[in-house]
C-alpha cells in the first residue's frame, strides 16, 4: 500500500480545516460555551464569566465570531449603551461538535 502525503493546499480546503479555523483561538470555545450556557449575555457579564480575558481581546474575539456568523450582536439605542450577544443557529450547530471534543478529552486525559 502506497502512502501519500496530504498537501497543505489540499488540507486547507477540507471541512475539517474550515471548522478548526472557526474555533481556533484561545477564548472562542469558552465564549461559545458561555453563550450556550447562559443564552443572551451582555459584554461585561461575558467578561465576568470568563475572568482572565482582557476587554480588548474579548471585543476582538466577539467581532471575529460575529463575522463568522456564529454569534449575533444586538445593540440597543440607549444611554448607557447596551449590547447583547447570543448564538446564531449556525453557532448552535457547533455545540454538539464541541461537546464531543470535551467528552473525548475527559475520557482520554493523561
Tell where the protein language model's regions lie, with residue ranges.
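Recognition helices and adjacent regulatory flanks at domain boundaries
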Residues: 1-12, 49, 102
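Long, contiguous secondary-structure blocks with strong helical propensity
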Residues: 8-9, 33, 46, 71-76, ...
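N-terminal helix-turn-helix DNA-binding core of bacterial DNA-binding proteins
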Residues: 10, 14-57, 84
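Generic recognition of well-ordered alpha-helical segments
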Residues: 18, 48, 60, 96-99, ...
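Alpha-helical linker/hinge and terminal dimerization helices associated
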Residues: 29, 68, 97-109
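Canonical helix-turn-helix DNA-binding module
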Residues: 44-73, 80
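Short helix-loop hinge/linker segments at domain boundaries
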Residues: 77, 109-110
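Basic, amphipathic "hinge/linker" alpha-helix immediately C-terminal to the N-terminal HTH DNA-binding motif
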Residues: 77-100
Amino acid at each position: 500500500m502506497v502512502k501519500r502525503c496530504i498537501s497543505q493546499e489540499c488540507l486547507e480546503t477540507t471541512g475539517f480545516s474550515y471548522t478548526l479555523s472557526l474555533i481556533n483561538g484561545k477564548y472562542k470555545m469558552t465564549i461559545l460555551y458561555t453563550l450556550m450556557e447562559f443564552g443572551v449575555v451582555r459584554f461585561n457579564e461575558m467578561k465576568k464569566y470568563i475572568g482572565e480575558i482582557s476587554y480588548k481581546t474579548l471585543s476582538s474575539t466577539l467581532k471575529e465570531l460575529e463575522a463568522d456568523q456564529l454569534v449575533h450582536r444586538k445593540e440597543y439605542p440607549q444611554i448607557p449603551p447596551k449590547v447583547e450577544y447570543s448564538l446564531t443557529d449556525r453557532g448552535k450547530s457547533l455545540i454538539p461538535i464541541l461537546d464531543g471534543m470535551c467528552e473525548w478529552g475527559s475520557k482520554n486525559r493523561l
